[in-house]
């Protein structure tokens, strides 16, 4: 779709599940999006960094969302590897 200036714009950009790489549809009301922020260990305040994970409803229905979040957090270095 084009706007008045002739630039291509998207009306809807679908999210993808971080665990299974499936597209999260607009009607998937069981899906969740978690944002984990970096915290300064001395002050306990939020820094500028953050990581966002989107989990689709199918993963949550199977009861695998906690394992998927731990796996993704280990891969990104948020949780230690021997957790």
UniProtKB/Swiss-Prot annotation:
Q: Which InterPro entries match?
A: Ribosomal_eS21, Ribosomal_eS21_CS, Ribosomal_eS21_sf
GO CC terms of this entry: cytosolic ribosome; ribonucleoprotein complex; ribosome; rough endoplasmic reticulum
- GO molecular function per UniProt: ribosome binding; structural constituent of ribosome
Q: What's a single GO BP term from this record?
A: lymph gland development
Compartments annotated for it: namely: Cytoplasm, Cytosol; Cytoplasm; Rough endoplasmic reticulum
Q: How does it assemble?
A: Component of the 40S small ribosomal subunit. Interacts with sta.
Q: Would you tell me the protein name for this molecule?
A: Small ribosomal subunit protein eS21
